[in-house]
Amino acid sequence: MMMNAFIEPAQHHLASYGLRMSPNTTASNSNAQQQQQQQLEMTQQQQQQQQQQQQQQQQDQESAAATAAAYQNSGYGHFNSYASRDFLLGRREAEYGVAGSAGQASAAADSMLFSGFPAQAAELGSGFGQHPFHSHHHHHQMRMGMADAYAAGHPYNHHGNFPTAAVHHPVVHHPSHHAMSAMHPAGAGAFLRYMRHQPASSASSVKQEMQCLWIDPDQPGLVPPGGRKTCNKVFHSMHEIVTHLTVEHVGGPECTTHACFWVGCSRNGRPFKAKYKLVNHIRVHTGEKPFACPHPGCGKVFARSENLKIHKRTHTGEKPFKCEHEGCDRRFANSSDRKKHSHVHTSDKPYNCRINGCDKSYTHPSSLRKHMKVHGNVDEKSPSHGYDSEGEESSSSSIITGGAQTPPSTRLDGSAGSSSGVSSLSGGSGIKSSPHSIKSEPNPMHSVHLGASSSGSSSTASSSASHLLQHQQHQHQQQQQQQQHQQQAQQQQQLTAHPSDPKSSPALQLMAASASAYLPPPLGPPPSHHHHPHHHQAAPSPGAAAASASMLHHNHHLLYHPAAQHHPPSDWYHTTAPSGSAEAMNPLNHFGHHHHHHHLMHPGAATAY
């Protein structure tokens, strides 16, 4: 430090010497050298960092080019544009300092380029799996649309690193899923159309073999149809078999018989009038369709040139066939449509409904098809309603008329000589019917248990009495009915045996009438084909057989043959009108019968009424 001589000596005791003190330059020089060294070191570090960045960029370029070249050789050359994009992404990530080291900075580009495919360059293995934010366990959540939850901490949000996933799980769970998600992180569907195409080599490797089944017509009558000699030559293309048929079997101008001898042909050897018609017919057996539609994007093919000509009019809009009726300007693309339309102007209705009982007819087949839907909506099927035209046989699958029921074609009418009250007016409606008159065909089940006739249409008193006697023979083998039913049945037997007994009181007669109305007479065991566990009581006296013959037969149907078996739910059961006698059936007797003997019948029988 230099002292000034003019300073007051009281304050500075060295001023009397007149000396000027200079600062120490050694310390300042050392500080300057240290600063220079630090600057040099910083400069060197910056240069090293720049060199490392340049080297990293070169490595990124080389790795991207190598990966793109590898996938170009494996058939995915249309993804070359990803190389430049991934290089820029890797450079951007290095600039932001996302990677922790120079080796980690190269992982961004590597994880983007189809890591799910097996074709990988050997020098790329070191860079896989080093992405700082990679997490294999989040891979499937990313693919399921949960990437938003991880986008905040992840700059690029690509988790398709397949080799790192292999570190966690050596066995690949879904290799195709990894591949598709790696190709397009936003969604694999954009590239699905490229994956579905089969290679041309596999399509060409499948050989189409066709066999000629033409029968040798030299001696067709001497050999049985199953033993005729066939050609059986095998061809590998449509052109080969068509050429073979044309040359070997159809023949040239010298052949005058134009008949098809293909195995199973429906023409049965009937010849054609011209050779070209036979050639067109053979295409039915070979499946050849040489006439393709030239319209772009149509792709339809046809076996006949006429059909192609008609089809072309759908593209051009041409309608050369004008309606021949005066005053009608309708035009059509083909003559068949014009013919269908021509019936509109005439009274002809050639398209008839073939359902039995339906007399509808229409001028156009489309109207008939709409009408047939009415019949098709009916779920019930009856064997008595079938087709009655064109020689077609009726089948059990034919449908009945929808909406209203058809009139009954056959009724189970009683004979004229049956017992009293069998045939009478039904409920005062004026319609003559028997107790078994239904709106359906007779069921074969009636003939099983009647034993007198196959259709069950004659139920006389003698036949009912024979049934009763037959039931009496089995009465000793049965157990007695419950006591309550037995007492009621005994009362009914007494009143039935002596209906005009003057000793009977009016109250007892009223009770007997009600009992006879609601309880059937005791019956014998059912036939062997029924499995109802009934128990019947003792039989009535033989004198009551003739009086209750018709009622016995009626109740026999109700007991052993539930109405659900032979009476459709929509059919009404016609009963006889009530008479003055106590033994006559009440029109409501089947309701009471179901009430008292519901345990003897099928659960679904009561719903038939």
Swiss-Prot record:
GO molecular function: DNA-binding transcription activator activity, RNA polymerase II-specific; DNA-binding transcription factor activity; DNA-binding transcription factor activity, RNA polymerase II-specific; RNA polymerase II cis-regulatory region sequence-specific DNA binding; RNA polymerase II transcription regulatory region sequence-specific DNA binding; zinc ion binding
Free-text tissue specificity from the UniProt record: Expressed throughout all segment primordia; expressed ubiquitously in the ectoderm and mesoderm precursors.
Chief place of localization: nucleus
Region spans: Disordered: 20-41, 373-550, 583-609
Record protein name field: Pair-rule protein odd-paired
Chain coiled-coil ranges: none
Biased composition (Polar residues): 22-32, 399-409
Bias (Low complexity): 414-434, 449-498, 538-550
Keyword field: Activator, Developmental protein, DNA-binding, Metal-binding, Nucleus, Pair-rule protein, Repeat, Transcription, Transcription regulation, Zinc, Zinc-finger
C2H2-type ZnF: 210-249, 258-285, 291-315, 321-345, 351-375
Top-level division of the source organism's lineage: Eukaryota
Record localization: Nucleus
Bridged cysteine pairs (disulfide): none
UniProt record similarity statement: Belongs to the GLI C2H2-type zinc-finger protein family.
Compositional bias of kind Basic residues: 528-537, 591-601
Pfam families: zf-C2H2, zf-C2H2_15, zf_ZIC
GO-annotated biological processes: central nervous system development; eye-antennal disc morphogenesis; germ cell migration; midgut development; negative regulation of transcription by RNA polymerase II; periodic partitioning by pair rule gene; positive regulation of transcription by RNA polymerase II
Keyword hit for Metal-binding: yes
InterPro entries: GLI-like, Znf-C2H2_ZIC1-5/GLI1-3-like, Znf_C2H2_sf, Znf_C2H2_type, Znf_ZIC
GO-annotated cellular components: nucleus
Protein purpose: Transcription factor essential for parasegmental subdivision of the embryo. It is involved in the activation of wingless (wg) in odd parasegments. It is also required for the timely activation of wg in the remaining parasegments and for the timely activation of engrailed (en) in all parasegments.
